[in-house]
Amino acid sequence: EYGTNVVAGVTPGKGGQMVLDGKVPVFNSVEEARTETNANVSIIFVPPPFAAEAIIEASDAGVKIVVCITEGVPVHDMVKAKRIIDQSGTRLIGPNCPGIITVDECKLGIMPGFICKKGNVGVLSKSGTLTYEAIGQLVNVGLGQSTALGIGGDPIIGTTMIDALKLFEADSETNGVVLIGEIGGQMENEAARWVKENMTKPVVGFIAGRTAPPGRRMGHAGAIVSGGDDTAEAKMRIMTECGIAVCESVAEIGDKMKAALNN
């Protein structure tokens, strides 16, 4: 529907079948699919106990971009998968993410492409639904998106905020970035400090979970306040100190980005 060139499916034991109105062949392994179709991207929709092995299989087959939608992948499994993909040079987005979309060009994942508008604002988020909300807020003020990606809300993910910010900074079609984080961990704080030292484009930030009680997981596996500077208030303060325009509410994202671009 969005123009993504789907050339193969992989399900062990079901090789030889045809799906999607008989247009797409199914293979028993990623290696076989890659050999037959030259596929260079893998999107993973397998149950949590098997997701990490699917990531490793794609990497071993030489696939350079892997998007894992699956939520609930065991942490120990992801430790192993992360080590392997880091050594192989595979770019993993996720797990527990909605994927990535370059507007009017290609979609990898489950994002509702119809809400997007082509433009020059990058969107980077741990949350799928907040990614969509940010896109909606941008469109409401007349701003389009270059690329939007959800990096995932699990403790161990393939592409970090800094990784994505580096790509947006180098992207000639991106003039500003919306950065959406949440409570728990240090990724947002590290990203904010990287922005201060390296980013030439305006960044608008939002942190979800301001009302979360300490010690209780809120939605994502990584969204838990353990004390120190991993609360929403602490992250918002650090973002502000690093020159990021911080939103108190997601409803401010569009207006804040419009003002940042005009400045």
What residues fall within each predicted segment?
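Catalytic-core regions of core metabolic enzymes
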Residues: E1-N263
